[in-house]
Amino acid sequence: DPEIAEMQVLDQVALSVIQWSGVDAQEVSLDWTQMLSPSHVQLFANAVQRLPRAFVMSNTAPAEAMTKALGHFDHGPNSARQVIDMSGDGTPNAGGEVNRLRRQAERSGVTINGLAIEGLGRASTNFYTRHVITADGFVETAQGHRDYARAIRRKILREISTVFG
């Protein structure tokens, strides 16, 4: 998306991708990459599109994903703002205490935003709203996996507009 790419380059955003699922299922799939030019953005987007799904038919352990993401900032570039973008299509059925990790993120100055992928109802959206996002965060909802592209674009534009406001 040209609008998103331009803003990412202007702010020199650094991105990384962590795939997650169950208690022992978190993987840094793409390490930190700083968006210094439109070609960096395009290369990163292409790499994301080529990523195979790391975990299939596993539990849902968001606390462990949050732990992995918080620790991953130690390996990234220095930045004025740190944001975890967490997406998922279910509520927890394994793992630790999500609220504790949310409080840890807030104490560390990390914002957590969510992208809830719904099937029927709003269980994931409600879970993300009540337990995952930080006080300065928000949840965007995708109505199924086919709606993900629209929802992620809207979510990224909202995050970036917070910076450029």
Predicted regions and their residues:
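DG-centered beta-turn motif at the end of beta-strands
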Residues: A69-L70, A80-A94, V132
